Amino acid sequence: MTQGEYSVQTFRDSVKFYVPRVEGYLETVREMAAKYSGMSMIEFDGYFEGRFEPVKYTRIEIHTNDVDEAQMMEAANRLRLSLKQESLAFEFNNKLILIAEKKSH
């Protein structure tokens, strides 16, 4: 096979959102699919926030070249608020980041 018979694309950034399957999550998936041309989804049971009963989660993974960490933190916080969650985790280039509401004392 010669080099002219195929093309190669490299994506610098990998973002993985851990989204609980609650009311509104499908709309989030649709918005991400429209914004980013390629993504993958994996469903799993999550045991977070000290809970014994599992919660259904979807990991949405996006590969792109046009985002930075601060943009993703803002996007994750908007997502957390729209899904009415106390916290939301995401990975940016293999670094796990937890976005949570501030606790008032």
List PLM regions with ranges.
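Positively charged, small/polar-rich N-terminal and surface patches that mediate targeting and assembly
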Residues: T2-H105
